[in-house]
Regions:
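Feature marks short, highly hydrophobic, charge-poor N-terminal signal-anchor/signal peptide-like helices
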Residues: 1-3
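Hydrophobic H-region at the start of alpha-helical membrane spans
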Residues: 5, 9, 45-48, 71, ...
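N-terminal signal-anchor/start-transfer transmembrane helix
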Residues: 8-22
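Alpha-helical architecture
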Residues: 13-16, 47, 74, 112
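Cytosolic-biased juxtamembrane loops and peripheral soluble domains of multi-pass membrane proteins
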Residues: 22-41, 64-192, 196-198
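Long, highly hydrophobic alpha-helical transmembrane signal-anchor segments
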Residues: 39-65
């Protein structure tokens, strides 16, 4: 196999290992009363990363790896492990919060709100650049940024509800959180409809 093939093979094994860990943590979080937000977008996220890996294999399996970009990639893997270790059992590929649990404030979370997404954004671009695929890097960076922008909005909502539960001494029930989120969304829709109705008058 070429250098590119070894790199993509490493990424596939890494992603499978992360999915296994994420499923384990997700089950534990749900058993502890965790609430999932934005579940509908999860399959899109999986599809995007699957297409990214498939495209890297098809276009880059026989390419050499640029040593400079490879060094950046290695640093990103160290940052990824730091994030996972900092979140511990709360690390997952889904957006899940525990009502009443304080946000993680150790590791890179002392300085960044979403360090994991910083790693993902950079990795999506760095790997194809390491294989000499700048257009591929641009296309998937744009797609990934669009999807992450939505995911970050969802996660910020989830963190806001977690903070609400914490301020109530952990007394906010799972159903209350979920219903409150749904009510907030429904209210936003009604407001938008009313604004549109007034505009058309």
């Amino acid at each position: 196999m070429g250098e590119g093939a070894w790199l993509v093979a490493f990424l596939v094994v890494q992603r499978l290992a992360e999915l296994a860990l994420a499923q384990w943590n997700t089950a534990r979080l749900r058993a502890a009363g965790g609430i999932e937000f934005g579940a509908a977008h999860y399959l899109l996220l999986v599809a995007l990363h699957s297409l990214w890996l498939f495209g890297l294999w098809m276009l880059g399996h026989d390419r050499a790896i640029d040593p400079l970009w490879l060094a950046v990639f290695v640093l990103l893997q160290a940052a990824r492990l730091w994030v996972i270790a900092s979140l511990g059992r709360r690390w997952t590929t889904r957006v899940i919060v525990l009502p009443g649990a304080a946000p993680v404030a150790r590791g890179p979370y002392r300085w960044l709100r979403h360090p994991n997404y910083v790693v993902v954004v950079l990795e999506i671009a760095v790997v194809p650049l390491a294989l000499g695929l700048p257009l591929f890097a641009l296309v998937f960076s744009l797609a990934n940024t669009t999807l992450l922008a939505y995911r970050i909005r969802v996660e910020n909502q989830a963190l806001a509800w977690a903070a609400l539960a914490t301020s109530n001494g952990g007394s906010v029930k799972a159903g209350t959180v979920a219903n409150g989120y749904a009510s907030s969304f429904a209210k936003s829709v009604r407001t938008a409809k009313n604004d549109l109705r007034h505009t058309n008058r």
